[in-house]
Amino acid sequence: MEHVAFGSEDIENTLAKMDDGQLDGLAFGAIQLDGDGNILQYNAAEGDITGRDPKQVIGKNFFKDVAPCTDSPEFYGKFKEGVASGNLNTMFEYTFDYQMTPTKVKVHMKKALSGDSYWVFVKRV
C-alpha cells in the first residue's frame, strides 16, 4: 500500500485513487464531506479515534449530528469559509470531546481534487 503522510500538500491526489478498504488502512482519520458538512466517507482510523462506527455516520451531518463539538468558529467557521471561497486548505489543533474522553488532535481540512467535496484529516497529537 502506498504511504500517505498526514498534512502532505498533494494528499487529495493520492486519496482520489483509493477505495474504501485503502482509506480504512490509513494511519489517520479521513472524513469526506459535501459542502453542507454531510459525511460521504468516514474511515476506520477516524472511528478508532472517536469510538463511532463509520457505517453509522455516513449521510449524517458531521458538525451537527456526529461531532457537535466542532460546531465552532475555529472548526466549522474555517470549513464554511473554505467552502465559500472554493479554496479550503487549513491545518490546526483541536480537542474532540463529544461523547468521548477529550482527545487532542491535529486537523487538516482540504478541498477534494475533483467534485464538490472536502476532506477532513485527523490524527491524535
UniProtKB/Swiss-Prot annotation:
It comes from the Bacteria. SUPFAM superfamilies: PYP-like sensor domain (PAS domain) (SSF55785). It comes from Halorhodospira halophila (Ectothiorhodospira halophila). This is Photoactive yellow protein. The keyword Glycoprotein does not apply. The keyword rRNA processing does not apply. Photoactive blue light protein. Probably functions as a photoreceptor for a negative phototaxis response. One of its GO terms (molecular function) is identical protein binding. The lineage of its organism: Bacteria, Pseudomonadati, Pseudomonadota, Gammaproteobacteria, Chromatiales.
